[in-house]
Amino acid sequence: MSILSQFDPAVAEAIQHETERQEYNLELIASENFVSEAVLEAQGSVMTNKYAEGYPGKRYYGGCHHVDVVENLAIERAKELFGAEHANVQPHAGSQANMAVYNAVCQPGDTILGMNLSHGGHLTHGSPVNFSGRFYNVVPYGVSPDTETIDYNEVERLALEHKPKMIVVGASAYPRIIDFPAFRAIADKVGAKVMVDMAHIAGLVAAGVHPNPVPYAEFVTTTTHKTLRGPRGGMILCREEYAKTINSQIFPGIQGGPLMHVIAAKAVAFKEALQPEFKTYQQQIVKNAAKLAECLMAKGFKLTSGGTDNHLMLINFTGTEITGKAAEEALDKAGITVNKNTVPFETRSPFVTSGIRVGTPACTSHGLKETEMEQVAGFIADAVANIGNDEALAAIQKRVNELMKKFPLYASRLK
């Protein structure tokens, strides 16, 4: 019996049940992934005990020589991974990374261009319920009604009209390749800075299966989980000329002590991402997404933009009685985890939605490949066809569990 299970069996039991859920359910939330045992070990280490305000070699606390080693490793590996001049690995999350860049470039009331949340953007790209929408004058851009892909001509028109201080590029639910040179050219016409939030595609970028935004943007932010398959956290990449400003905007600007156990885990994840097998893994994520999209469309599902170029897709129920909320709940009962999601030109409430977001990073970490994607599409179709039929959904769950048992993830952690 573990120390935790002896002292706090309630927490230990919840952790065990979550381990079983991750092991036996089909995880299709596009922003989720499973870290390696090495990353778990680093994050669960004694590094969690150390305060280390400041930066390597310039701390406000003594005893930081060992945490300096891991932070420097994380920084240098991140720079190598993305070809960046400077990396700050201290942001606790992607939102803090984005906030630091806003603070470095903009004053309250300045104009920014950001992707409309319902068209695939992110809360921190100017949503009115977020700090980014409250502090700045936000001009949203979106996708074309015809292609459901980014309308670059409209972005240029808006930029020329509103003269933004910064253009925010990136998305949380956009299934297509983003044209970074096009955004750079638009920004240059109006003298704007470019911030690319590559949180969703960082792993794809690191492996060279999606274009790299670093050469085209003054600032690139990301989370370190999602496709990058590291611990939950954030990071900022920037040109050397902005290094001091960015560092000061993180500490002491918006954060105090960094989470050194998480930074240690980031360093490990970045080393993993530098290995040849990581490229193979990212290529498989994209292959799986393409196959799943193909199979879903063959079963009659409408996908926003007609498919995917990356790791995710949006199943669009517009024009049907099915809602994203109902589909999410039915799939959950079938052992398949997705999230309801707004779709472009959404007509329903964000608490109900007309779509679900589906992604392949986590199931690819389990080892599923194209053959299994055909089965996955069948599970999804069967579950959506049986909304409200709990008996049928329970039967699908058994089939899902049987499939996932063939692809163990954390076998040593199961009882």
UniProtKB/Swiss-Prot annotation:
Its EC number is 2.1.2.1. Keywords: Amino-acid biosynthesis, Cytoplasm, One-carbon metabolism, Pyridoxal phosphate, Transferase. GO terms for cellular component: cytosol. Pathway: One-carbon metabolism; tetrahydrofolate interconversion; Amino-acid biosynthesis; glycine biosynthesis; glycine from L-serine: step 1/1. HAMAP family: SHMT. It is found in: Cytoplasm. Belongs to the SHMT family. The keyword Cell inner membrane does not apply. It comes from Trichlorobacter lovleyi (strain ATCC BAA-1151 / DSM 17278 / SZ). Catalyzes the reversible interconversion of serine and glycine with tetrahydrofolate (THF) serving as the one-carbon carrier. This reaction serves as the major source of one-carbon groups required for the biosynthesis of purines, thymidylate, methionine, and other important biomolecules. Also exhibits THF-independent aldolase activity toward beta-hydroxyamino acids, producing glycine and aldehydes, via a retro-aldol mechanism. SUPFAM superfamilies: PLP-dependent transferases. (6S)-5,6,7,8-tetrahydrofolate binds at L117, G121, H122, L123, E241, S349, P350, F351. It catalyses: (6R)-5,10-methylene-5,6,7,8-tetrahydrofolate + glycine + H2O = (6S)-5,6,7,8-tetrahydrofolate + L-serine. Homodimer. This is Serine hydroxymethyltransferase.
